[in-house]
Structure formats: structure tokens, C-alpha cells
């Protein structure tokens, strides 16, 4: 990753800089590989030491807790964490600070510890998910109903139901490609004036979630098409997917022209 364009939590950095100014010894303790962690520490310029994954030791959970206890002693340090892996570290830390955690991690942390600081997520997971899969773009797929309207078949119940199912399948397929596109373009998006605010680029929606949901949305689109629509529609969906993936790999002008021709194929597919 390009270190200077990573999505840093400014609210946390402000607090850490205040602590540093008051004489605190700051350690970047992370499960990230040390080659990346050291570059991050050098870029931020506030950490006195880096404790990170190296070799066969993954510096997370119990490994991180043991390392910090050896360095500073049990209950002799404050720890800022964000995931369920951090419970093992919070168990042995003096002060617990929760940063950018999920609702479940935050709730459990508040029930287990005397939490000193909470830096909450800007938006909920559901809102971030909706933004990541670009639900607002689904309206573009309403074009699928235009041929029904033009052929006066919109009042045909079976055709209308098939149209709605096709709309859902196309929307799920499109969302899978949006996730793929944002994963592939994450470094470029982080350097872009406006795209850096997209959930994945901004770090509000994790790559792990994106990698998990991408095949789910794609699989759902294929399954819906296979179960409820003619095989011709599934073939059309496959062409649509190939075209949109081609778009993701940079052939945007070709895609724009081809998409106009593609719309004329849809009416005969369901």
C-alpha cells in the first residue's frame, strides 16, 4: 500500500499526539507485517517503537498480549484496539480504549471493562454496506422495464414478475462488480479527490468483508436467474458480468458503447 494515502483515523491521531506531547511512550502494536508497520510509524512520526508481525509469529491476540506484558508488565500500559482479537490485550492492560470497533465489539467491551476512550465509527455497518454496494445505482437497472413498457407487456403479471426478478438479479450482479472494482482500484481511489471517500478506500468497509460479499452477491444473482428465469437470461447476465468486469479493468469507453447495444438484447431474455 501507499503509506501516505492510507485512511488514518484523525480523531485518534489527535489524541495520540496529545499523549505524546505529555510525555507518553507510544508503541505501534499491530498484526500487520513489520515492513508495513515500520513505514506507517515513520510516516506518522509519533511512535517510539513498533511491535508487529514478523516471521512465523502473528502479533495478534495472545501473542500481542504476551509481548506487551514482557515489555511493560501486566496492567502497566494503555491499549487502543478495535477487534475481538484485542480482548486478550485489554484483559492485561491498565486502561482500555476502543477505536472504530463494530457494534458488537464495542458493546462487549463496555460490559467487560472500564473503557476510558471510545472513538466510534462514523456510520453503522449496514449504512456502510449499502453505500459500498451502491444501492443508489440499482435504479439504472430499471431500464429493464422499458422494453416491457414499449411492448405493452407491463400489465402482464408473469412478465412483470420476471422483470422484477431480472431487476434484482442485475442489481446483485452489479453490486458484486462494484465491490470487485473498489477492491482493485483501492490504491488509485485513495489518491483521488472524491473517490477516496468510498467505503473501501476510506477504510470504513474492510477488504475482508468485500472479499466475502463479492462472491455472495454474484452467486445470488446467478442462483436467482437459474431458478426463476429462462436460460437465455442467465446467458445475458453472463455477458453483462463480463462487460462490467471489463469496465473494471479499464476499458470504459468500449463498455459505454457496448452497453447501449446490450440493452436491446434484454427484452427477449425473460
Describe the residue ranges of each PLM region.
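Membrane-interfacial amphipathic/re-entrant helices at transmembrane-helix boundaries
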Residues: 152-167, 219, 223-230, 252
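Alpha-helical transmembrane segments of integral membrane proteins
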Residues: 127, 139-143, 158-169, 209-213, ...
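Membrane-embedded alpha-helical segments that form the functional core of polytopic membrane enzymes
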Residues: 146, 156-184, 232-246
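Acidic (Asp/Glu-rich) catalytic motifs at the cytosolic membrane interface
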Residues: 80, 173-201
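Interhelical loop and helix-boundary elements at the membrane-water interface
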Residues: 124-140, 199-210, 246-264
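Alpha-helical transmembrane segments of multipass membrane proteins
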Residues: 145, 149, 219-226, 242-246, ...
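Multi-pass membrane catalytic core of lipid/isoprenoid biosynthesis enzymes
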Residues: 193-234
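C-terminal cap/substrate-recognition subdomain and adjoining C-terminal extension
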Residues: 4-154
Amino acid at each position: 500500500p501507499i503509506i501516505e494515502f492510507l485512511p488514518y483515523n484523525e480523531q485518534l491521531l489527535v489524541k495520540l499526539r496529545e499523549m505524546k506531547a505529555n510525555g507518553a511512550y507510544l508503541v505501534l502494536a499491530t498484526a500487520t507485517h513489520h515492513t508495513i508497520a515500520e513505514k506507517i510509524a515513520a510516516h506518522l512520526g509519533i511512535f517510539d517503537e513498533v511491535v508487529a508481525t514478523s516471521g512465523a509469529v502473528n502479533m495478534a491476540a495472545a501473542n500481542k498480549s504476551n509481548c506487551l506484558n514482557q515489555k511493560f508488565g501486566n496492567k502497566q500500559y494503555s491499549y487502543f484496539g478495535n477487534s475481538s482479537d484485542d480482548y486478550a490485550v485489554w484483559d492485561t492492560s491498565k486502561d482500555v480504549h476502543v477505536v472504530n470497533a463494530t457494534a458488537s465489539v464495542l458493546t462487549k467491551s463496555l460490559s467487560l471493562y472500564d473503557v476510558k476512550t471510545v472513538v466510534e465509527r462514523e456510520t453503522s455497518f449496514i449504512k456502510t454496506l449499502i453505500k459500498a454496494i451502491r444501492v443508489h445505482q440499482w435504479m439504472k437497472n430499471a431500464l429493464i422495464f422499458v422494453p416491457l413498457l414499449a411492448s405493452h407487456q407491463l400489465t402482464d403479471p408473469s412478465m412483470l414478475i420476471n422483470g422484477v426478478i431480472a431487476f434484482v438479479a442485475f442489481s446483485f450482479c452489479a453490486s458484486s462488480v462494484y465491490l470487485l472494482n473498489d477492491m482493485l482500484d483501492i490504491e488509485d481511489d485513495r489518491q483521488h479527490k472524491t473517490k477516496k471517500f468510498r467505503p473501501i478506500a476510506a477504510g470504513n468497509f474492510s477488504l475482508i468483508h468485500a472479499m466475502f460479499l463479492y462472491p455472495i452477491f454474484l452467486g445470488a444473482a446467478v442462483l436467482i436467474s437459474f431458478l426463476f428465469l429462462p436460460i437465455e437470461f442467465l446467458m445475458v447476465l453472463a455477458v453483462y458480468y463480463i462487460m462490467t468486469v471489463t469496465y473494471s479493468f479499464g476499458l470504459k469507453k468500449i463498455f459505454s458503447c457496448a452497453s447501449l447495444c446490450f440493452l436491446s438484447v434484454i427484452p427477449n431474455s425473460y
